[in-house]
Amino acid sequence: MTRRRRSRPLTRDEVIDAALGIVDAAGLEALTMRRLAADLGVEAMSLYYHVPSKDVLLDWTVDRMRTELRLPDDVPGDWADSLEAVFMEYRRVLTAHPNMLPLAARRTGTEGMSGLEFLIEQGLPVEDAVDLYQSLVGFTVGYALLGSAAIEAVWSGLPPALGDRLREWRDDTFRRTLRTLLDGYRHRERGA
């Protein structure tokens, strides 16, 4: 089989976009340098000009997915209201990329540090900031798993009204529980 030739040079952004596309379409295990190269019409070794290693590519792919977060410029209220908006949106993005969930759970990237810095700047003690941030990420990833295709496949076999109610329950419960978690830390911070 003859490999198609590229008419222009490959960019790092194209590599990352193609990697995310492979994971979205076929799962994380389908992302190999050989598959990525074939999809891009290049030799596998040429990818290493743009990407130092597959591990780095995985980090960049998570970062690319997170660029889809649509965050408001200004959220009325305090830090807890801001975090509620951020994690509602993070869940939306994770649910849109269910095959990325294992990576997103393990790779926080620079967002983890900026999230912790934000909480510390708001006056939370370092220990509380770390606990809250880790809890928010774990909770959000867990709920995104409840929105995964596997769960939807199970729910699709239920009577339509029950499946619809379970979806509503999942969404309502996520927001309520997120708010309860944030309110608890807000109360601790005010009481300190």
PLM feature spans:
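Actinobacteria-biased recognition of intrinsically disordered, low-complexity terminal regions
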Residues: 1-13, 20, 34, 186-192
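C-terminal peripheral helix-coil segments that are non-catalytic and often amphipathic
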Residues: 2, 124, 149-192
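Helix-turn-helix
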Residues: 14, 18, 22-56
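Amphipathic alpha-helical interaction segments
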Residues: 14, 56, 85, 89, ...
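Short, basic, alpha-helical segments at the C-terminal edge of helix-turn-helix-like DNA-binding modules
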Residues: 63-68
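A contiguous pocket-lining binding segment that forms or flanks enzyme active sites
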Residues: 113-145
